[in-house]
Amino acid sequence: MIDRYKHQQLQIGSVSPQQISAWANKILPNGEIVGEVTKPYTFHYKTNKPEKDGLFCERIFGPIKSGICACGNYRVIGAEKEDPKFCEQCGVEFIDSRIRRYQMGYIKLACPVTHVWYLKRLPSYIANLLDKPLKELEGLVYCDFSFARPIAKKPTFLRLRGLFEYEIQSWKYSIPLFFTTQGFDTFRNREISTGAGAIREQLADLDLRIVIDNSSVEWKDLGDEGSTGNEWEDRKIGRRKDFLVRRMELAKHFIRTNVEPERMVLCLLPVLPPELRPIIQIDGGKLMSSDINELYRRVIYRNNTLTDLLKTSRSTPGELVMCQEKLVQEAVDTLLDNGIRGQPMRDGHNKVYKSFSDVIEGKEGRFRETLLGKRVDYSGRSVIVVGPSLSLHRCGLPREIAIELFQTFVIRGLIRQHLASNIGIAKSKIREKEPIVWEILQEVMQGHPVLLNRAPTLHRLGIQAFQPVLVEGRAICLHPLVCKGFNADFDGDQMAVHVPLSLEAQAEARLLMFSHMNLLSPAIGDPISVPTQDMLIGLYVLTMGNRRGIFVNRYNPCNRRNYQNKTVDNNNYKHTKEKKPYFLSSYDALGAYQQKRINLHSPLWLRWRLDQRVIGSREVPIEVQYESLGTYQEIYGHYLIVRSVKKEILCIYIRTTVGHISFYREIEESVQGFCRAYSYGT
């Protein structure tokens, strides 16, 4: 459908019978209305032409060949002549054959049929609205029992029998035996109700606003009662309150969308266009047909049988009519969702038929494979890997992908700079991978964002914009902080990259879709750009330090047992003899690490600014080391204090590693950058 802003969109919901007939009905020049499929046939076995009023009828769904009717007559499509648009003999419209991809038909059901999605899928919408158990409604739909109509102060057959509303199940087989078809119809229309028609009547009698009011009052009453002291009763009340909330939300949805609840019961069954359920002839003259055709045939056969029982047969017992209505209901259930009621229907080769639900759901369904999974131009796909040196808003594109995505822009750049006289020469330069090509590609990519998408796109953050940079290799590099929004990890996941072409799309990508603009979850507002998986492991490795500690002696808890037992191996003895380095600043420590004088986890002493928390601490030093000049060092668990002869604090050293220093500096620079940006903004 197309809305008032001329946006194409797809809307899924229940449809009225009038809308279904409007989709299919066509009026011929002689006044005949076509659109109803009444015969279960497909093609004639001799002529290989579609059967009239069948599942592939050309009058209903359009011609197989453009501009050629079933008689073989030809008309020019779109010619402004006074020739009739319909063939006078066969009634086929002279139109493009592509109409068979969207022209629908319908089957007029002899009895109402419930839509199995609304009845059997959990939660059951019909059971929620009617506030009745699902098992009871199933028995009513499949004609296992009936209920009495409320007829006040009138003599009825049921009153003579002394029956009440839910006692008719025992009369399931006895009541229909007393009546022929006409008599049973009269009795049923007046006194009892069964099948999907009973559900339709109850849904039509519902006042949704009264349903909301009654449910709200009951919910408040249950809330005012408080706890009963019985755990089982409290759970029962809690489940009832949850049910009432779902019922109110469902009723509000029907009111908001202006949908009548009785639409959940079908009177007209839509028939899909023939091109969506084709019959194909393969080698050897054999035919391959879609399973949906066989399921439609099953529905039409049973529906026609029920129509004959109701119209032509005068002596058919009412029990047979009820059984046939049940068969029609089961056939429609199988068409919509095969196997939802138990054992699925199978063909002669014991293969399960693919119903309408099987066609549209899943990874290979109509939506995900055909509609959402289309191949588009200016797009690529590759495996994602970690880009540790990337900023949050950047992604690394392999040269092979980037040159293909931005090839047209590079060609334009080569021609504008007079490096190529035409498109052919520009393409040859790109194929030869000349150095000037990569320079122009860099210029093009600087001002052009790209979109990264990871399927399935379940929420808004499944597609985000990034500033691309060229990287070596064949994998897309990604900052690990954006993985949570994509629900991605680096174990072989693939992502698609798209190039926004129009200026509007590029502006939208920059203003709304850049990764650094989507730091919070749109659903709950919590931070979504948080360290996960690989990044947490990296932070752990960076800050785990050395288990031996800065002192390998009796003061270290890790080695106290070894000291007591006097069993120190050679490796520990070597560390004991090593003197731990002292550094005046973090720059000196990082420089020593880059020169490979120390390791990432090597313990060291780093001079630190005077901290009042350290100065005022009451912690007892582990060891005190005196020097020849009178100064001494008080060694604690995680720091040491250098004091003068007069016991004044000269300086403080903390025990740390290069990994801790790197982590601290990254956080410090980030906080300072945020503060500067905030001060500029204010």
Curated annotation (Swiss-Prot):
Free-text comment on the cofactor: Binds 1 Mg(2+) ion per subunit.
Database matches in Pfam families: RNA_pol_Rpb1_1, RNA_pol_Rpb1_2
Gene Ontology cellular-component terms listed: chloroplast; DNA-directed RNA polymerase complex; mitochondrion
Cofactor list: Mg(2+); Zn(2+)
Location of this chain's protein in the cell: Plastid, Chloroplast
Residues reported in the UniProt entry to bind Zn(2+): 69, 71, 87, 90
GO molecular function, one term: zinc ion binding
Protein name: DNA-directed RNA polymerase subunit beta'
Gene this protein is translated from: rpoC1
Gene3D superfamilies: 1.10.40.90, 2.40.40.20, RNA polymerase II, clamp domain (4.10.860.120), RNA polymerase Rpb1, domain 3 (1.10.274.100)
Coiled coil (UniProt feature): none
Functional note: DNA-dependent RNA polymerase catalyzes the transcription of DNA into RNA using the four ribonucleoside triphosphates as substrates.
Reactions catalysed, as given in the entry: RNA(n) + a ribonucleoside 5'-triphosphate = RNA(n+1) + diphosphate
PANTHER family in the record: DNA-DIRECTED RNA POLYMERASE, DNA-DIRECTED RNA POLYMERASE SUBUNIT BETA
Binding site for Mg(2+): 489, 491, 493
Keywords: Chloroplast, DNA-directed RNA polymerase, Magnesium, Metal-binding, Nucleotidyltransferase, Plastid, Transcription, Transferase, Zinc
Enzyme class of the recorded protein, top EC level: transferase
InterPro entries recorded: DNA-dir_RpoC_beta_prime, RNA_pol_asu, RNA_pol_N, RNA_pol_Rpb1_1, RNA_pol_Rpb1_3_sf, RNA_pol_Rpb1_clamp_domain, RNApol_RpoC1
GO biological process, one term: DNA-templated transcription
Subunit structure of this chain's protein: In plastids the minimal PEP RNA polymerase catalytic core is composed of four subunits: alpha, beta, beta', and beta''. When a (nuclear-encoded) sigma factor is associated with the core the holoenzyme is formed, which can initiate transcription.
E.C. number: 2.7.7.6
